[in-house]
Amino acid sequence: MDFKHVSVLLEECIENLNIKENGIYVDGTLGGAGHSSEIAKRLSDKGLLIGIDQDENAIKAAGEKLTPMKERIKLVRDNFSNIDAILQNLEIDGIDGILLDLGVSSHQLDEADRGFSYMHDAPLDMRMDTRQAVSAMEVVNSYTEKDLENIIKNYGEEKWAKRIANFIVDFRKEEPITTTHQLVDVIKRAIPKGARIDGPHPAKRTFQAIRIEVNGELEIINKTIDDAVRNLNPGGRICIITFHSLEDRIVKNAFRDLSNPCICPPEFPICRCDRKPAVKIITRKPIVPTEEELELNPRARSAKLRVAEKI
């Protein structure tokens, strides 16, 4: 199966995982297995890579790509937020590193019938896991106007959220919005012409917001980080790639809280709560793609990598 996906910040991720040849590593967002194949190459027969993805196509494609190294790889179709249960089922007590590449993959964007992209006309879907019930079509056609406004404003950081939500609700009174290009047309009508001249595609932020809502992307990040860190062996690292400011802010704050968990009032001269740091932050500032990488893969432009190490 052809699963086209260019791995972002590949060398930087591999370097920061500090891979030990006999270690156990998790790629929580398997995708096209670009990161996974490089991790697996560095493992001995005693090492193990666990590749997780909720996308059935990703699992199938990765299985084919990783066949030469299959003895040191286990693939799991699940959401990385279930890392605790996944490791328990595999009877694994601790891991030496975990990588999360958040957001939608290049393959999912390019696979027109998945409905992730505003560039292709397709059924409104946007489900990363096609087994789940709620799709973008349900969100767009059944959520209240206020709920749509909040989603588009909070998850898309879209200044025209109120107008877009209003236009969506008005349109669906006449007929349901069932395709991506229908939704794009509604969004374009909602945003004043002058505001559409500069900047990204007018539908970009709204599509991002709806995708995040459909897949519960932001809700699971904090829980996943806590669970992942708890399962890391001392010295093990967690590497997370984000693609927009909402994700990056959550990761940054989660790492900060885990590295400085003191809950004492600020007026206390010394810590009395005795809460110990769980990690040390490796990247005080996020790692971003080089100009060379951006020339090869413009979609990497907004990527940021943050790394923390279990104490």
Curated annotation (Swiss-Prot):
InterPro entries for this protein: RsmH, SAM-dep_MeTrfase_MraW_recog, SAM-dependent_MTases_sf
Catalytic reactions on record: cytidine(1402) in 16S rRNA + S-adenosyl-L-methionine = N(4)-methylcytidine(1402) in 16S rRNA + S-adenosyl-L-homocysteine + H(+)
Gene3D superfamilies reported for this sequence: Putative methyltransferase TM0872, insert domain, Vaccinia Virus protein VP39
Keywords: Cytoplasm, Methyltransferase, rRNA processing, S-adenosyl-L-methionine, Transferase
Pfam families listed in its UniProt record: Methyltransf_5
Enzyme class: transferase
Chain residues that bind S-adenosyl-L-methionine: 33-35, 53, 80, 101, 108
GO cellular component: cytoplasm
GO terms, molecular function: rRNA (cytosine-N4-)-methyltransferase activity
Protein's cellular compartments: Cytoplasm
Primary subcellular site in the record, as a coarse category: cytoplasm
GO biological process annotation, one example: rRNA base methylation
EC number(s) from the headed UniProt entry: 2.1.1.199
HAMAP family: 16SrRNA_methyltr_H
Function: Specifically methylates the N4 position of cytidine in position 1402 (C1402) of 16S rRNA.
PANTHER family: 12S RRNA N4-METHYLCYTIDINE METHYLTRANSFERASE (PTHR11265:SF0), S-ADENOSYL-METHYLTRANSFERASE MRAW (PTHR11265)
Family from the record: Belongs to the methyltransferase superfamily. RsmH family.
NCBIfam families linked: 16S rRNA (cytosine(1402)-N(4))-methyltransferase RsmH
Protein name in UniProt: Ribosomal RNA small subunit methyltransferase H
Record organism: Alkaliphilus oremlandii (strain OhILAs) (Clostridium oremlandii (strain OhILAs))
Gene name in the database record: rsmH
